[in-house]
């Protein structure tokens, strides 16, 4: 993606160099390596802008082509966070900036499969690898409807990420009101009624920042 093709201007200021990722692969065990035995430095390191990338949904380093996925939202959000303007964008839209932190590095962890599905094992593997890598922040623009306060075996992973010093940011969801997921149908509950259960999981967990 050309939005992520521009590398940070100060190589000494980046958190991860290619040598750093190589050292992690040599000294620690990632779920990525267990999912794809062919995982190596050259398959997960893309550039100083994207020092790590893995497709947890399909269990391989290959992300496929743009035509293979129904979920481009993560790429959109990554652009808002750390995207860089291309010369074409600058000329066509008269823009001076794109991402909020254009010098930031991106660790890309794909957790949606080609059908638009995301399962707990994808997420848990990705988050635990994020802990192993020692990332600063994790953004999750995802969630299941009417999330619980606690979900055994899942909540603990998010707690561990926060305890490791990772700022875990999760989208609150777009359900609007409880009736959206009601067994009785939307028409049985007025949208003006006081509602509950509108936050999605994992945004309901105590240890995350939900926006």
Can you annotate each of these PLM segments?
Residues 61-62, 69, 84, 108-207:
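Substrate-binding/access-modulating region of protease and related hydrolase catalytic domains
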Residues 1-119, 133-136, 163, 178, ...:
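Subtilisin-like serine protease catalytic core
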